[in-house]
Amino acid sequence: MIDSEALESERVKLKRDIADLRANLNRKEQCLRELEAAIAAGEDSDEAEESSNDMPTPQTKLTNDDIARYSRQLILQDFGVQGQLKLKNSSVLIVGMGGLGCPAAQYLVAAGCGHLGLIDYDEVERSNLHRQILHSEHRCGMSKAESARIALLELNSHCQIRCHSRLINSMNAMHIIRPYDVVLDCSDNVATRYLLNDACVMLRKPLVSGSALKMDGQLTVYGYGQGPCYRCIYPVPPPPEAVTNCGDGGVLGAVTGIIGAMQALEAIKVIIGLGDVMSGRLLIFDGSSFMFRNIRIRTKRPNCHVCSAQPLITELIDYEMFCGMHATDKDNPLDLLEPDQRLEVKEYHQKLQSQPHLLLDVRPPAEFEICQLPRSINVPLSEILDDSYLKRFAKQLEDKELPIVLLCRRGNDSQIAAQHIKNRFPAHSIRDLVGGLHAWTGSVDATFPIY
C-alpha cells in the first residue's frame, strides 16, 4: 500500500533541496563575481596574507581626505591629529565576524583604522542576518570574512583588509596574530577564548574580549599593562554542559551591536592611549533593564599558568581537549548518555511513536511555541532539574513500563534531562532523541521548521 504521507514528505524535501541548490548556485555566482572584481582591483586577500607579515611604512601626515573624513573626531581635544595618525598606522585583528565582530569592524574602519585582519572559518547563513550587520541576503553562502571585507571596503576603501577564512587554532594562531597591535575576541567560544588569551600573552598583545547572550553582554580587556589575563580570572574551563551559546540560548541583535561597538571603542583607546581602558574591570550590560555595571575583577594571579613570571604554559596546547568542547558553535553535541539510553528519530518514528509513551519536550516555552511534535508535552529543563515536574507527572511515573522520551532542539538539553530523571528513577525506560528536532527535520519530516 502506498504511503501518501511519506511520498508527500519526500516530494516536499526534494523541492526544498532543489530550491536550496538553485539559491546556493546563485550565491556562489554572486560571490565569484565579487571576488573577481576584488582581484582585478588588486585587493585579493589571500595574496595579501601570504605576501608578508610586515605592515606598510608608517604614515606621518594626514591627507586632505583624511582631514575631511575624520574631522569630527580630529577636533576632540584628547584625540587630535596624533590620535588619528596612531589609528591610521594601527593594525587590529578581529576573531569572529559574527554579531560582535561585524559592528566592531564597522566602527574601526569608519574611524580610520589603517589595517584590519578578519578571521572566520564560517559562511554566511540567513540565521546570521538579524545581528551580523555587515552581511546580506545575496552573500549567503560566502565566507564571512570575505563578505565583511566587501561591506567594509564600501565604507572605507582606504583601509587595508586581510581575510583569514579559516579556523584559528594552535598551529596557526601565533603566525596570524603576530603582525597585529590589538586583538578583538568576538568568537563567543570558550576554547577560542583560552587560545587567544594564551597567544596574546605570549606575543604581548592586548586582547579586547566581548560576549553576548540573550539580553546580556560583557566586556573587558585582558593582558593590558599590569592587568590580568583570561586565565587569571578563569584558570579552569567550565564543564561543557554548563556552556550556552547564542545558537542555543538566543540573542537579541541590538545587544551584540552594543557590545561590538564598545569593543571597537576599547581598541581605539588602547591604540591611541585615550581614557581609562577596561583592564582589571568587567562591564556587565543587562539589556532588559538597560543597566550597566562596572565591577572590579581580580588582579593578576601570581601563579597564573600563562602570564606569571614563571609560566607553566609556554606554548599553545590543544584547547578543544583542554576545554572538552569544540572551538566552534556549530553542532557541538554533548556525549552524556550511553548508546542504549538514546533513541534515533527514525526508530522513534517507526516503532515507539504509535505506542504508549511520555514525550517530554524540555525546550523553553518560547521555543516550544515555535514548533512542536504531536503528543509532546512542554516541560522546560529548569523544571526537570529542580524536580518540580514530579507532582505534575506523578501518575505516569508510577508506571515503570511506560517509556519516557526526552526531546529538545539539537539533542543536548535532552541528555541532561534524561540523565537527571534516570538518576531518580533507575528502573524506568528513559531515553532521549539523538539530534533533537533538527534530526527530525533531516530524517523524518522535511516540512518541519528549523530554527
UniProtKB/Swiss-Prot annotation:
State where the protein is found: Cytoplasm, Cytosol
Q: Which residues make up the binding site for Zn(2+)? A: C229, C232, C304, C307
Enumerate the UniProt keywords alphabetically.
Answer: ATP-binding, Cytoplasm, Metal-binding, Molybdenum cofactor biosynthesis, Multifunctional enzyme, Nucleotide-binding, Nucleotidyltransferase, Phosphoprotein, Transferase, tRNA processing, Zinc
Catalytic residues identified in the record: C246, C408
Q: Where is the composition biased (Acidic residues)?
A: 43-52
Which Gene Ontology MF annotations are present? ATP binding; metal ion binding; molybdopterin-synthase adenylyltransferase activity; molybdopterin-synthase sulfurtransferase activity; thiosulfate-cyanide sulfurtransferase activity; URM1 activating enzyme activity
What's the record's note on cofactor binding? Answer: Binds 1 zinc ion per subunit.
E.C. number, please?
A: 2.7.7.80, 2.8.1.11
Region of interest (Disordered), ranges: 42-62
One of its GO biological process terms is:
Mo-molybdopterin cofactor biosynthetic process
Any one cellular-component term (Gene Ontology): cytosol
Which cofactors are named for this entry? Zn(2+)
Instruction: Please list the residues that bind ATP.
Output: G99, D120, S127, N128, L129, H130, R131, K144, D188, N189
State its role: Plays a central role in 2-thiolation of mcm(5)S(2)U at tRNA wobble positions of cytosolic tRNA(Lys), tRNA(Glu) and tRNA(Gln). Also essential during biosynthesis of the molybdenum cofactor. Acts by mediating the C-terminal thiocarboxylation of sulfur carriers URM1 and MOCS2A. Its N-terminus first activates URM1 and MOCS2A as acyl-adenylates (-COAMP), then the persulfide sulfur on the catalytic cysteine is transferred to URM1 and MOCS2A to form thiocarboxylation (-COSH) of their C-terminus.
This chain's protein is named: Adenylyltransferase and sulfurtransferase MOCS3
Originating organism:
Drosophila persimilis (Fruit fly)
